[in-house]
């Protein structure tokens, strides 16, 4: 048998196994989600005090309007945009400017990336396209806070985890 045919057969077998593994992964998501959120909270606890003690502003970055939007038809997009906001804006800035906690913030980011990847693979959790006005407001406030924005955003990360948990728990039963 030619080598290319053997490789093609191997690819077909591997891709079907991968596809069924991904489906199984989504079937068990409701049982693994609490552990993923617990790991996210544990990773955040290692930097929580650092950022919250440096947050001297009374400005609210994350409030109940985000939770309400997560519960609305835009929930999927709001969650997707908030994860992107933390991964692409907040955490890189926190790692760059706060060398004392760089490694811990990096670890927190990796856990959030793993959760995002899992959510994207299981389409029923993130099947969305519309833009979120609340997340836009969060981003605008973050930018207005300039240097203090990173402390505010990282200090509020636990609120975001709680809201994310509510959104995901609401969708597991569907």
UniProtKB/Swiss-Prot annotation:
Pfam families listed in its UniProt record: IL10
Subcellular location: Secreted
Biological processes, Gene Ontology terms: immune response; regulation of cytokine production
One Gene Ontology term of the molecular function aspect: cytokine activity
Signal peptide: 1-16
InterPro entries in UniProt: 4_helix_cytokine-like_core (IPR009079), IL-10 (IPR000098), IL-10/19/20/24/26 (IPR020443), IL-10_CS (IPR020423)
Glycosylation sites: 17
Covalent S-S links between cysteines: 26-122, 76-128
Gene3D superfamilies: 1.20.1250.10
Predominant subcellular localization, coarse grouping: secreted
Keyword terms: Cytokine, Disulfide bond, Glycoprotein, Secreted, Signal
One cellular component (GO) term of this entry: extracellular space
Claim: Signal is one of the keywords in the record: yes
Purpose: Major immune regulatory cytokine that acts on many cells of the immune system where it has profound anti-inflammatory functions, limiting excessive tissue disruption caused by inflammation. Mechanistically, IL10 binds to its heterotetrameric receptor comprising IL10RA and IL10RB leading to JAK1 and STAT2-mediated phosphorylation of STAT3. In turn, STAT3 translocates to the nucleus where it drives expression of anti-inflammatory mediators.
Family (UniProt): Belongs to the IL-10 family.
Subunit structure: Homodimer. Interacts with IL10RA and IL10RB.
Protein name, entry field: Interleukin-10
Gene: IL10
């Amino acid at each position: 048998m030619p080598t290319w045919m053997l490789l093609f057969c191997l690819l077909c077998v591997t891709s079907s196994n991968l596809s069924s593994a991904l489906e199984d992964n989504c079937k068990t998501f409701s049982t693994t989600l609490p552990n993923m959120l617990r790991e996210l909270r544990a990773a955040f606890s290692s930097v929580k005090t650092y950022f919250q003690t440096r947050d001297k502003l009374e400005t609210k970055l994350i409030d109940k309007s985000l939770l309400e939007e997560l519960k609305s038809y835009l929930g999927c997009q709001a969650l997707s945009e908030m994860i992107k906001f933390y991964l692409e804006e907040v955490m890189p800035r926190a790692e760059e400017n706060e060398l004392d906690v760089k490694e811990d913030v990096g670890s927190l980011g990796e856990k959030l990336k793993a959760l995002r990847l899992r959510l994207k693979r299981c389409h029923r959790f993130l099947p969305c396209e519309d833009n979120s006005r609340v997340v836009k407001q969060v981003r605008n406030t973050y930018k207005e806070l300039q240097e203090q924005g990173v402390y505010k955003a990282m200090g509020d990360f636990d609120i975001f985890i709680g809201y994310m948990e509510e959104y995901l728990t609401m969708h597991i039963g569907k």
